[in-house]
């Protein structure tokens, strides 16, 4: 058997995410975030004559999956799609797929992307500022940090990083780049630290975490892509089909919760004796409170601490 590519990635909420889809052995399923292929592999174990379509825009994820899922690929049980999941509907349509039985999302950055210092995601490892999930796109963290005006940086840091020192950090960046371009992750992390009061530096967690998150979200338009994709997924689902979404920070969770609430709520006009079928909510929430990782999982998978799983079921087209 071929050796797998170095793509160490502990799958979060593995069983919960797939099991709550109530997989039909002959169904059509989508893993919108292939990553390390953990969810795909487990979902495939539940299929007999069904088929799985797995999306990822990261080339390394695809190379890893070609090895990890080699048997299922040979049996034509899975199709790997190199694309941003915001093109979910059109990519599936090209393959003749217009309806699916279930879909899962594991949002956020895969561990290997953080671990590969050359990708420029980590504030702990020296690398050129990059943060592109799709290596073919032009916008990178370097352009955001060096070219965006002060006001745009403040907006991004506050909106996507929820950092109360957004103005101070943006000002420090603006001053530094007038002297020379800010080129590396450590250079940026040190700048962020220099903009913060001493008491902030003593708090738990890395002081650059929120700002790096904000820049990453901007570079990859993560929230915009997630919103577009989840909306498309709901439309693609067959009646009784399910959608599972794992989020890792409050912005992703709020977005998912808002979309699910919008599709699962009906404002019934007063005096209406019976609700017509076409006025029923499109979705039914399977869990009102998010599913969290078990104590057992938290012991071996640090990434699971912030993970939240929300699941919904399609009730009507």
UniProtKB/Swiss-Prot annotation:
It is an enzyme of class 2 (transferase). InterPro entries: RsmH, SAM-dep_MeTrfase_MraW_recog, SAM-dependent_MTases_sf. GO terms for molecular function: rRNA (cytosine-N4-)-methyltransferase activity. GO terms for biological process: rRNA base methylation. It catalyses: cytidine(1402) in 16S rRNA + S-adenosyl-L-methionine = N(4)-methylcytidine(1402) in 16S rRNA + S-adenosyl-L-homocysteine + H(+). Its main location: cytoplasm. Its EC number is 2.1.1.199. Pfam families: Methyltransf_5. Keywords: Cytoplasm, Methyltransferase, rRNA processing, S-adenosyl-L-methionine, Transferase. One of its GO terms (cellular component) is cytoplasm. The keyword Acyltransferase does not apply. It is found in: Cytoplasm. S-adenosyl-L-methionine binds at residues 37-39, 56, 85, 106, 113. Belongs to the methyltransferase superfamily. RsmH family. Specifically methylates the N4 position of cytidine in position 1402 (C1402) of 16S rRNA. This is Ribosomal RNA small subunit methyltransferase H. The gene is rsmH.
């Amino acid at each position: 058997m071929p050796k797998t590519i170095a793509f160490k990635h502990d799958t979060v909420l593995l069983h919960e995410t797939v099991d709550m889809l109530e997989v039909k052995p002959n169904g059509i399923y989508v893993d919108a975030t292939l990553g390390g292929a953990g969810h795909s592999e487990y979902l495939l174990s539940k299929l007999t004559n069904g088929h799985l379509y797995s999306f990822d825009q990261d080339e390394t994820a695809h190379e890893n999956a070609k090895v990890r899922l080699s048997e299922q690929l040979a049996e034509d049980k899975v199709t790997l799609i190199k694309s941003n999941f915001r093109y979910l509907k059109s990519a599936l349509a090209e393959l003749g797929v217009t309806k699916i039985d279930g879909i899962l999302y594991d949002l956020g950055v895969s561990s290997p992307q953080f671990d590969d210092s050359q990708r420029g995601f980590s504030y702990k490892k020296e690398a050129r500022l990059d943060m592109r999930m799709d290596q073919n796109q032009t916008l990178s963290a370097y352009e955001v940090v060096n070219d965006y005006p002060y006001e745009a940086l403040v907006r991004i840091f506050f909106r996507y990083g929820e950092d109360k020192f957004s103005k101070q950090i943006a000002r420090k960046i603006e001053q530094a780049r007038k002297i020379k371009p800010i080129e590396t992750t450590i250079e940026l992390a040190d700048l962020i630290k220099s903009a913060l009061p001493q008491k902030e530096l003593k708090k738990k967690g890395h002081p650059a975490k929120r700002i790096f998150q904000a820049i990453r979200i901007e570079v990859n338009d993560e929230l915009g892509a997630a919103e577009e994709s989840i909306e498309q997924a709901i439309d693609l689902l067959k009646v009784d089909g399910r959608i599972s979404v794992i989020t890792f920070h409050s912005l992703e969770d709020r977005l998912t919760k808002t979309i699910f609430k919008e599709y699962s709520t009906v404002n019934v006009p007063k005096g209406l004796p019976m609700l017509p079928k076409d006025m029923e909510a499109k979705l039914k929430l399977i869990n009102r409170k998010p599913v969290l990782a078990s104590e057992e999982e938290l012991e071996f998978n640090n990434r699971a601490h912030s993970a939240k799983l929300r699941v919904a079921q399609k009730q009507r087209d």
